[in-house]
């Protein structure tokens, strides 16, 4: 998995915050911003309950690293990977309901991609950022995730590709909000579930 992204609200663009993050055999990317209504990023919230040693294990210093560390905590509690992601989003949404939690996480056996946007419409702050880069017309696509089934020469299912915004993608299916795709890295089979 790989991910090109802008820095989250009011966070520096530094190497430690580049994706993917990797810890405990998992790779993680996050296409979102975990901030309150005033644009204050979760990293400035010293009272948010996160295991500091787990956070440090991600190698990052951003909201995405906090999100990943919350997922890792749920895995440590014994949750399956897909449910750990769902639980982490539920927990984070209690404090940051309008944030975007779109992400992908990959283990040796699975790829999970989640579309979980806190807003139906792209926020004005995101539109401004896109405008700064001359891409304002693409801002509406900011939180959209898509998947496409791959077929082999015989027409049999051979896997799935998941992608997010930024270019025209004919022939792809939209991953609905609060929906995840769970893909086997072993045989390419997949299923959808809601969180």
Language-model regions: role of each:
Residues 2-195:
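N-terminal segments that mediate ammonia production and transfer
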């Amino acid at each position: 998995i790989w991910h090109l992204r802008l820095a989250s609200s009011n966070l520096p663009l530094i190497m430690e915050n580049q994706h993917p993050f990797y810890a405990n055999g998992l790779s993680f990317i996050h296409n979102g911003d975990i901030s309150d209504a005033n644009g204050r990023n979760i990293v400035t919230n010293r009272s948010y309950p996160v295991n500091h040693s787990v956070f440090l294990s991600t190698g990052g210093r951003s909201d995405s690293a906090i999100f990943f560390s919350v997922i890792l905590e749920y895995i440590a509690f014994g949750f399956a990977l897909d449910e750990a992601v769902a639980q982490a989003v539920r927990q984070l949404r209690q404090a940051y309901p309008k944030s975007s939690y779109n992400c992908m996480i990959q283990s040796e056996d699975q790829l999970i991609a989640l579309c979980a946007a806190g807003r139906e419409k792209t926020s004005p702050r995101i539109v401004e950022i896109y405008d700064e880069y001359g891409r304002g017309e693409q801002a509406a696509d900011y939180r959209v995730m898509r998947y496409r089934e791959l077929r082999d020469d015989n027409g049999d299912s051979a896997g799935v590709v998941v992608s997010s915004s930024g270019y025209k993608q004919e022939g792809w299916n939209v991953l609905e909000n609060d929906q995840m795709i769970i893909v086997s890295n072993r045989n390419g089979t997949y299923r959808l579930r809601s969180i």
